UniProtKB/Swiss-Prot annotation:
GO terms for biological process: cell division; mitotic cell cycle phase transition. It comes from Oryzias javanicus. The gene is ccnb2. This is G2/mitotic-specific cyclin-B2. GO terms for molecular function: cyclin-dependent protein serine/threonine kinase regulator activity. Residues 1-78 are annotated as: Disordered. It comes from the Eukaryota. Coiled coil: none annotated. Essential for the control of the cell cycle at the G2/M (mitosis) transition.
Amino acid sequence: MSSVEAVTQQQLLAAENPVRMGKGAADPRRAALGEITNRNAAAAANRKMGPSKKQPKPSCAQKPQPVVHTSAGDPAPISADMSMKVEQDLSQAFSEVLMLAVQDVDEQDADQPQLCSQYVKDIYKYLHTLEEQQAIRPNYMQGYSVTEHMRALLVDWLVQVHSRFQLLQETLYLTVAILDRFLQVHPVSRRKLQLVGVTAMLVACKYEEMYPPEVGDFAYITDDAFTKFQIVEMEQVILRSLGFQLGRPLPLHFLRRASKVADADVEKHTLAKYLLELTLLDYHMVHYRPSEAAAAALCLSQLLLDGLPWSLEQQHYSTYDEQHLKPIMQLMAKNVVQVTEGRTKFLAVKKKYSSSKLMKISLIPQLNSSTIKVMAEALQNP
């Protein structure tokens, strides 16, 4: 779903507002009331006055003007206008050099209309705006009866339900996004937390899936702890609380874009997906924007697998430099260490990514390396 517009915004503006060249480039500006006088009357008045008296010719003998001699080494004086023009030319040249340093990753996609190469820059600019509008506050459950441990338990169970129903990856991320967005504006009791979670997945399925499971399937998956009527009733509460705004950008959208920019292989992309999915259980990462999480996941993935730094192209297209992503990468490293060393009982994501279908990415030795351990320890010893 990713690609960048082949026509820049400046070119679009130039096409819509072409600059006139030649004589018509700038219309003569008339003085106030200067062109609404009677020109014929003015000409007649001049005729009445008669011919003007001839002015005496100036004498041929002119007073000699002093000549200023400048040495060859003295620079010629530069006017203010010329100086400003030089600065503008230098600034434009510098900008062009920067643009040349960044490769256009979508220039080869013009013949593939499904990649929207002409609009992809505007699309991702809009997604960045949208994720800010639908942000999640840090520590939003402060003062709730529901704890971060209960939330992690619920999300771990939802990962298993997601695998059981064989749903799309987008459905899982949207489920957790709906859960957090709803809980931050509508606190619930512990008894209803699972009801909110399973209903959030129902709403996400209706939004993402072609053939979503039925309400009865979700009632069954809870061992009939909740009835179909309760699930439908909670669905209405969730939708009203969110104002029916479900189109929050997902980390997967930005990860696919980032992988295209980096020309990442399947292993790097899959490892980044694993790192991203582990963040779903981490309550202390809910406030990070999806674009930030996706960029940090790929940055950590390529660092672990190939030791590659965050490139200029990746910084340009993601809008984040490596220094900005570092604290997010440290939190991701902490999650990996906890799962790898068995410090947590929430292992649904690790088990999911230990399958051959997902390249057994959660079992690779790089996740137990000194690199990731040092990064995780940096949180304890900043």
